A protein has these predicted regions:
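N-terminal, polar/charged subdomain of small-to-medium soluble alpha/beta proteins
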Residues: 1-89, 100, 104-149
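Short glycine-enriched, charge-decorated loop/helix-capping segments at active-site entrances
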Residues: 90-95
Length: 149
């Protein structure tokens, strides 16, 4: 499982019917599911995400977590995070989870976040969405549960 975590002043996802979810201060997270991901990958990502000290406190950067600051999360599913461009010019998505596994893992990820009590919002799986954000920093962190295995 791979996350691109962006510290944002605001973020918004707009759906095909023009409805939307939005946040102010918080984190915009793009979540990619690997074909070999299991439940422990979800748990590890959530632990890292909720404990990540990325926000400032007393004029010091990287002191507080999203929980400490009571900020919000916007999580967008993004199968292209496992796109491989090492051969040719067209990305290969053979490492991305198929639609069934991807949806199951994304839904489980979101349910665990909701149950944690964090203020979080999501996108709609396997749907074209428009994402707007105002990055703060910019600060972008990439975390992949497959690295180091």
């Amino acid at each position: 499982m791979k996350m691109i975590i962006q510290k944002v002043l605001s973020a918004k996802v707009i759906f095909e019917d023009n409805s939307f979810n939005s946040i102010d201060d918080g984190l915009l997270v793009y979540l990619g599911v690997h074909k070999d991901d299991i439940e422990k990958d979800i748990d590890l990502c959530i632990k890292k995400l909720l404990g990540l000290r990325i926000f400032e406190y007393n004029e010091k950067n990287f002191e507080k977590s999203i929980i400490d600051k009571n900020f919000k999360l916007l999580v967008i599913s993004n199968f292209t995070l496992y796109g491989d461009i090492s051969r040719g010019r067209r990305p290969s998505f053979t490492n991305s989870a198929n639609a069934e596994l991807g949806k199951e893992m994304y839904d489980n990820f979101m349910n665990k976040l909701y149950n944690s009590g964090i203020n979080c919002y999501g996108g709609i799986f396997q749907t074209h969405m428009l994402v707007e954000s105002v990055n703060d920093g910019p600060i972008n962190i990439v975390f992949d549960t497959k690295e180091g295995e």
